[in-house]
Amino acid sequence: MNINSTLFLQAVVFAILVWFTMKFVWPPITKALDERAQKIADGLAAADKAKSELSSANKRVEAELATSRTETATRLADADRRGQGIIEDAKARAVEEANKIIAAAQAEAAQQSVKAREALREQVALLAVKGAEQILRKEVNAGVHADLLSRLKTEL
């Protein structure tokens, strides 16, 4: 074989190889590469979508946290106000009860003072009668002199 025919024959074989490769080998390879590229693009799109969903979920969570914080602060303030009101009511009731107890004690003390004065008046009247009896050296009849004794009690 001659170099020219060999070269021509090799060029024909090479052309057949290129045609065979382009017809039967190249399409499955390009199809596989295209599918792989599509999967990668879908994965990146899903990652971007998940990232945006995560961002929006984080924003919703932050909004909910802010809402719950303000609600908690409001409830704590309400509870504190109610607690202060209950304490003030209890103090007012305690002061009122103390005033009632003091008034009752003062009334009882005044009543006992009146009773003690009456008892002392009667004792003084008896002592005065006994003293007068001893001075006069004779017995004074309480029934006969009841008017005199009652006037003496009122004067004392």
Swiss-Prot record:
The chain crosses the membrane at residues 7-27. SUPFAM superfamilies: F1F0 ATP synthase subunit B, membrane domain. F(1)F(0) ATP synthase produces ATP from ADP in the presence of a proton or sodium gradient. F-type ATPases consist of two structural domains, F(1) containing the extramembraneous catalytic core and F(0) containing the membrane proton channel, linked together by a central stalk and a peripheral stalk. During catalysis, ATP synthesis in the catalytic domain of F(1) is coupled via a rotary mechanism of the central stalk subunits to proton translocation. Component of the F(0) channel, it forms part of the peripheral stalk, linking F(1) to F(0). Belongs to the ATPase B chain family. One of its GO terms (cellular component) is proton-transporting ATP synthase complex. It comes from the Bacteria. It is found in: Cell inner membrane. This is ATP synthase subunit b. F-type ATPases have 2 components, F(1) - the catalytic core - and F(0) - the membrane proton channel. F(1) has five subunits: alpha(3), beta(3), gamma(1), delta(1), epsilon(1). F(0) has three main subunits: a(1), b(2) and c(10-14). The alpha and beta chains form an alternating ring which encloses part of the gamma chain. F(1) is attached to F(0) by a central stalk formed by the gamma and epsilon chains, while a peripheral stalk is formed by the delta and b chains. PANTHER family: ATP SYNTHASE SUBUNIT B, ATP SYNTHASE SUBUNIT B', CHLOROPLASTIC. Pfam families: ATP-synt_B. Keywords: ATP synthesis, Cell inner membrane, Cell membrane, CF(0), Hydrogen ion transport, Ion transport, Membrane, Transmembrane, Transmembrane helix, Transport. It is a single-pass membrane protein. One of its GO terms (molecular function) is proton-transporting ATPase activity, rotational mechanism. CDD domains: ATP-synt_Fo_b.
